[in-house]
């Protein structure tokens, strides 16, 4: 609460930057946006109607330029994917890939993920949640901005169907350690390993990660399931 009794603003885990939108991305936003982009609305989505079928649904938060999400969706046509991203160049890049690959099992929401989870996705509806390489906010004074905090993890777990999973990945060891502590403290979840897991096939290697591996950088994956 603030001094005047109002609600304290939520600290967001991202900063909106005016990134350059390429010509191909801009064209994809105009031509493919109406098909693939779902406008934010404070009411629950009917996912069966959105995808015109009944299938497992996986949410990916912060898909970046969309390379990994497009690859995963192409490899798993039996699963529907909902990608949430706030940055316009990334949304345009993913739409371009969806068009080129003729993928119909992805929808995009360009909005704050916490608000999407709270208002648009019903409890116990998701088969999985992916959050790969969220901003590490590596300076200690910025750790409060990190996405993976107890309130969000509780919200994420509530949107998973029983047996559904949360898969996190980071290349910052201290963030991986924080993730492990936070997820293990959530009563709705259980770890699928003693601590971290080898990279599952459901997380494709991106060019960024391949470069990091060549430079000797570590990557930590965590997979927890809803009890």
Swiss-Prot record:
Pfam families: Methyltransf_4. Substrate binds at residues 139, 171, 206-209. Pathway: tRNA modification; N(7)-methylguanine-tRNA biosynthesis. Keywords: Methyltransferase, S-adenosyl-L-methionine, Transferase, tRNA processing. One of its GO terms (molecular function) is tRNA (guanine(46)-N7)-methyltransferase activity. S-adenosyl-L-methionine binds at residues 60, 85, 112, 135. GO terms for cellular component: tRNA methyltransferase complex. NCBIfam families: tRNA (guanosine(46)-N7)-methyltransferase TrmB (TIGR00091). Belongs to the class I-like SAM-binding methyltransferase superfamily. TrmB family. This is tRNA (guanine-N(7)-)-methyltransferase. It comes from Thiobacillus denitrificans (strain ATCC 25259 / T1). The gene is trmB.
């Amino acid at each position: 609460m603030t001094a005047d009794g109002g609600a304290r603003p939520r600290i967001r885990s991202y900063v909106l930057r005016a990134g350059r939108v390429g010509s191909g991305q801009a064209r994809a936003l105009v031509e493919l946006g109406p098909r693939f982009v779902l406008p934010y609305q404070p009411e629950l989505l009917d996912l069966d109607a959105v995808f015109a079928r009944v299938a497992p649904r996986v949410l990916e938060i912060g898909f970046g330029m969309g390379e990994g999400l497009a690859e995963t969706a192409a490899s798993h046509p039996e699963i529907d994917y909902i990608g949430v991203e706030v940055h316009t160049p990334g949304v345009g890049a993913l739409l371009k890939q969806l068009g080129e690959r003729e993928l119909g099992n992805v929808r995009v929401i360009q909005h704050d993920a916490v608000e999407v989870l709270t208002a648009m996705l019903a409890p116990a509806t998701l088969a999985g949640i992916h959050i790969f390489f969220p901003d590490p906010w590596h300076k200690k004074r910025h750790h409060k901005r990190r996405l993976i905090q107890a309130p969000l993890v509780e919200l994420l777990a509530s949107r998973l169907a029983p047996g559904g999973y949360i898969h996190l990945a980071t290349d910052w060891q201290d963030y991986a350690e924080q993730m492990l502590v936070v997820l293990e403290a959530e009563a709705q979840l259980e770890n699928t390993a003693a601590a971290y897991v080898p990279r599952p096939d459901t997380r494709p290697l991106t060019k960024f990660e391949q470069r990091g591996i060549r430079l000797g950088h570590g990557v930590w994956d965590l997979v927890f399931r809803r009890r």
